Amino acid sequence: MSTFMAKAEDVERKWYVIDAADKPLGRVASEAARLLRGKHKPIFTPHVDTGDHVIIINAEKVALTGKKLTQKLYYHHSRYPGGMTLINYGTLLKTRPERAVEKAIKGMLPKNRLGEQMYRKLNVYKGEAHPHQAQKPEAWTIRD
């Protein structure tokens, strides 16, 4: 008997919606990364994208513990001398809350082409509304 290896064409993809309101950022990000990788499925294969589509709503209401609103920094560099940009989480949450959640999730995905494929199945929205009602997404609850 040989080990089962999933093929990309055999994977049935579902859509899940996660409500991030008043949930810790790390919990939301780790659950979303788990769904995007497909680790919740019995057919999980590390070298095949077996994950599902994930929609995250209420990104602006995500919770942080401690002093992370002022102390957690995101770095970006333009590759020009003196081109480093620092932005703290509080500012990022006010201006682009969906980007803060996306960065947390992307850091938990593989750093290769397969990780990029998985990241493309992520949709983050700052409010309640999302344009994916036609896909009939299932609600995924985050443990507290």
Curated annotation (Swiss-Prot):
Alphabetic keyword roster: Ribonucleoprotein, Ribosomal protein
Coiled-coil features, chain-numbered ranges: none
An annotated GO BP: negative regulation of translation
Record GO cellular component, one term: cytosolic large ribosomal subunit
Molecular-function GO terms, alphabetical: mRNA binding; structural constituent of ribosome
CDD domains, alphabetized: Ribosomal_L13 (cd00392)
InterPro entries assigned: Ribosomal_uL13, Ribosomal_uL13_bac-type, Ribosomal_uL13_CS, Ribosomal_uL13_sf
Source taxon at top rank: Bacteria
Disulphide linkage map: none
Quaternary structure, from the entry: Part of the 50S ribosomal subunit.
Family according to the record: Belongs to the universal ribosomal protein uL13 family.
Protein name: Large ribosomal subunit protein uL13
Gene: rplM
